């Protein structure tokens, strides 16, 4: 069965057909790294990591890029408050980000570009928009001419007239039209800045993603994803910038995950009700939070509370217990029983059911229901007077198959993603030191744990084998 996904651009489910057969170019908007991530940041990390896992499970070669915004107003404010420079703060919280999402079972992207490392590409992008007549300079600032782009508003499904009715030019802004948005901001005294054709300054938020997508993935990509709050203006503006420059469809499919509420109230820093991931995982198994997030369809809102997370723990434990019971019965059963084929068919039905749910817009909530049904049948099977090892093995392998996509583990023996990343870094260091014996040893160790490595020009990529 083919994958169908809900495309925000068309507001309907569509059959997934990548631009190039067998390959997927995927970009996910990453965090602004001025603080530890909260659970609202964790949701897209978990959701799109799972989407990537499933695309790979289906045989696609996925090129996955997710950025860091390592310079903007929030970072500058944090730097001033802490008496540190912007690069120091961003580096600290990038490291913390990897620790937090690694604990949640998220693999690193193939590339994690940062704004400060791609300033030349950003400036070049802005310069080309100016030369094509889609942008203009005003006293050191550069603005995008929103009305010059005919398709503006197509992602958020708003007309120019609707947008204009609520737009205002704030005091100090030097733009020609209230709908125009900043591509480049002139430097302010004491702020971090870069040289450009328009004087010292720094980029606007929206241009950063457009420039990095173009640099690392090209003019067109298959999937662009992020939180629902990014639909407008961020993703709308990305489309305008990129399509104005290239004349091509920027992204074929747009995926957006829903909001997170805290105790039935929208999470916001102004209300002081946001919850940091590193606080949660001090008290709970990090995999529990991932399981909790995936128990709701990615487009639906999630209501989070400590009570709900605690309630989820008992459900997660039931899966782990079923899996553990299978492991303990292995090698203590007979070789053949008379109804083996029926049970093997039952196990196979769960693979088909899992794929059917995931093919339908990555419905992890229903996919987890398939896991519980698998656990129920495993428990029934283990209650038999006589069991067969090859049937128990089939149950175990089906559990492993499903949870390898969902990204959590039911057994203690499986390596966490962060442990895999650490081993890969140790192997990379061995290769840099020309210690090929150690490098091969680590590769073989990972292979024995069903971890497949691929060395590319962009670095080492890995996936769990089927």
Swiss-Prot record:
This protein's GO CC annotations: cytoplasm; cytosol
Binding site for Zn(2+): 29, 209, 234, 238
Phosphoserine PTM sites in chain numbering: 270
Pfam families documented for this protein: DALR_2 (PF09190), tRNA-synt_1e (PF01406)
Binding site for ATP: 269
EC code(s) of this entry: 6.1.1.16
GO molecular function: ATP binding; cysteine-tRNA ligase activity; zinc ion binding
Residues spanned by motif 'KMSKS' region: 266-270
Compartments, as annotated in UniProt: Cytoplasm
Catalytic activity of the protein: tRNA(Cys) + L-cysteine + ATP = L-cysteinyl-tRNA(Cys) + AMP + diphosphate
Motif ('HIGH' region): 31-41
Domain of life: Bacteria
Required cofactor(s): Zn(2+)
Coiled coil region boundaries: none
GO biological process: cysteinyl-tRNA aminoacylation
Cofactor mode of binding and number, as noted: Binds 1 zinc ion per subunit.
Keywords carried by this UniProt record: Aminoacyl-tRNA synthetase, ATP-binding, Cytoplasm, Ligase, Metal-binding, Nucleotide-binding, Phosphoprotein, Protein biosynthesis, Zinc
NCBIfam families: cysS
Family: Belongs to the class-I aminoacyl-tRNA synthetase family.
Subunit structure and binding partners: Monomer.
Name the UniProt record assigns to this protein: Cysteine--tRNA ligase
Organism of provenance: Bacillus subtilis (strain 168)
């Amino acid at each position: 069965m083919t994958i169908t996904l809900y495309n925000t651009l068309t507001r309907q489910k569509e059959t997934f057909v990548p631009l190039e057969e067998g390959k997927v170019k995927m970009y996910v908007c990453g965090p602004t790294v001025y603080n530890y991530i909260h659970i609202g940041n964790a949701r897209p990390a978990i959701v799109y990591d799972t989407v990537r896992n499933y695309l790979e499970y289906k045989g696609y070669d996925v090129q996955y890029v997710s950025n860091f915004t390592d310079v903007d107003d929030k970072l500058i404010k944090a730097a001033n408050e802490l008496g540190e420079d912007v690069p120091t703060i961003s580096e600290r919280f990038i490291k913390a980000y990897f620790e937090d999402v690694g604990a949640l079972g998220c693999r690193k992207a193939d590339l994690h570009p940062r704004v400060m490392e791609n300033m030349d590409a950003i400036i070049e992008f802005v310069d080309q928009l100016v030369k094509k007549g889609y942008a203009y300079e005003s006293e050191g600032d550069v603005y995008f001419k929103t009305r010059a782009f005919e398709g503006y508003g197509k992602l958020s499904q708003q007309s120019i007239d609707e947008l204009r009715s609520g737009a205002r030019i704030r005091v100090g802004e030097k733009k020609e039209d209230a709908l125009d948005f900043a591509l480049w901001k002139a430097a302010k005294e004491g702020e971090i800045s870069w040289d450009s054709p328009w004087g010292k300054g720094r980029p606007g938020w929206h241009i950063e993603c457009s420039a990095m997508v173009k640099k690392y993935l090209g003019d067109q990509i298959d999937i662009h994803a992020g939180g629902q709050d990014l639909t407008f203006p961020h993703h709308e503006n990305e489309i305008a910038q990129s399509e104005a420059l290239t004349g091509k469809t920027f992204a074929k499919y747009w995926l957006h995950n829903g909001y997170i509420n805290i105790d039935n109230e929208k999470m916001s820093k102004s209300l002081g009700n946001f919850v940091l991931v590193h606080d949660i995982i001090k008290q709970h198994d990090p995999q529990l939070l991932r399981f909790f997030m995936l128990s709701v369809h990615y487009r639906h809102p999630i209501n989070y509370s400590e009570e709900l997370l605690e309630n989820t723990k008992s459900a997660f434990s039931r899966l782990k217990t079923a899996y553990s019971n299978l492991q303990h019965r292995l090698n203590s059963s007979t070789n053949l029983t008379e109804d083996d084929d029926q049970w093997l068919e039952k196990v196979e039905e769960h693979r088909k059911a899992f794929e059917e749910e995931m093919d339908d817009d990555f419905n992890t909530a229903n996919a987890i229901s398939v896991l519980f049904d698998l656990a129920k049948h495993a428990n029934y099977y283990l209650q038999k007077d006589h069991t067969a090892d090859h049937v128990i093995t089939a149950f175990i392998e089906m559990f492993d198959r499903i949870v390898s996509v969902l990204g959590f583990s039911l057994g203690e023996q499986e390596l966490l993603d962060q442990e895999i990343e650490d081993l890969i870094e140790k192997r990379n260091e061995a290769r840099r030191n020309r210690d090929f014996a150690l490098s091969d040893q680590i590769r073989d160790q990972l292979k024995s744990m069903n971890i497949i490595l691929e060395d590319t020009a962009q670095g080492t990529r890995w996936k769990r084998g089927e």
